[in-house]
């Protein structure tokens, strides 16, 4: 959704100017959770027959000052433009841009057995040195089929230091030699 991406980009710019990048991030995802789980909000938000002024007033009462004025103004703008549906997309575009700015990277760590925080700290230092990853968010998965070692997946990069990966590489080389 191009419109949702534009709203997210505008919020990022505003968040940078106002020093509220993280506040906007938290509140947008809070908003997403409300949309998923709160029937009262959904009844108000997705009622296209309700007058815009009434909807704005009810949204303001619903949040009762627990929301940043810029986010509230975004909600008002979406109501005015009759673009309520795109509120569900804005947080994800915002997160994508926000993560790039602050250096957050989701790193899938595949290991043959559980690892401790000391190993994750070493991986974190290595990622910073080798790839400039400042804030890795580790998603650890245990996969006994890799036999040993470790496999990292992030930003379309695969670092395979597993025993299975090494054996697969050797097998490919042997097949090449056998074909020649």
UniProtKB/Swiss-Prot annotation:
It comes from Caldicellulosiruptor bescii (strain ATCC BAA-1888 / DSM 6725 / KCTC 15123 / Z-1320). F(1)F(0) ATP synthase produces ATP from ADP in the presence of a proton or sodium gradient. F-type ATPases consist of two structural domains, F(1) containing the extramembraneous catalytic core and F(0) containing the membrane proton channel, linked together by a central stalk and a peripheral stalk. During catalysis, ATP synthesis in the catalytic domain of F(1) is coupled via a rotary mechanism of the central stalk subunits to proton translocation. It is a peripheral membrane protein. The keyword Coiled coil does not apply. SUPFAM superfamilies: N-terminal domain of the delta subunit of the F1F0-ATP synthase. It is found in: Cell membrane. GO terms for molecular function: proton-transporting ATP synthase activity, rotational mechanism. F-type ATPases have 2 components, F(1) - the catalytic core - and F(0) - the membrane proton channel. F(1) has five subunits: alpha(3), beta(3), gamma(1), delta(1), epsilon(1). F(0) has three main subunits: a(1), b(2) and c(10-14). The alpha and beta chains form an alternating ring which encloses part of the gamma chain. F(1) is attached to F(0) by a central stalk formed by the gamma and epsilon chains, while a peripheral stalk is formed by the delta and b chains. The gene is atpH. Pfam families: OSCP. Gene3D superfamilies: N-terminal domain of the delta subunit of the F1F0-ATP synthase. This is ATP synthase subunit delta. Keywords: ATP synthesis, Cell membrane, CF(1), Hydrogen ion transport, Ion transport, Membrane, Transport.
């Amino acid at each position: 959704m191009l419109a949702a991406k534009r709203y997210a980009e505008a919020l990022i710019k505003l968040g940078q100017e106002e020093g509220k990048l993280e506040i906007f991030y938290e509140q947008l995802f809070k908003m997403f959770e409300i949309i998923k789980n709160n029937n009262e909000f959904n009844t108000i938000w997705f009622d296209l027959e309700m007058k815009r002024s009434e909807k704005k007033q009810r949204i303001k009462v619903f949040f009762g000052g627990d929301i940043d004025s810029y986010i509230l103004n975004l909600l008002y703008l979406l109501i005015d433009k009759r673009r309520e549906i795109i509120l569900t997309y804005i947080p994800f575009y915002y997160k994508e841009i926000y993560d790039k700015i602050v250096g957050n990277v989701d790193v899938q760590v595949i290991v043959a057995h559980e690892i401790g925080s000391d190993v994750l700290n070493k991986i974190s230092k290595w990622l910073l040195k080798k790839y400039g990853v400042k804030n890795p968010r580790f998603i650890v998965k245990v996969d006994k089929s890799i036999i040993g070692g470790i496999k990292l997946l992030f930003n379309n990069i695969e670092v395979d230091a597993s025993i299975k990966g090494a054996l697969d590489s050797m097998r490919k080389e042997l097949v090449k030699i056998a074909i020649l």
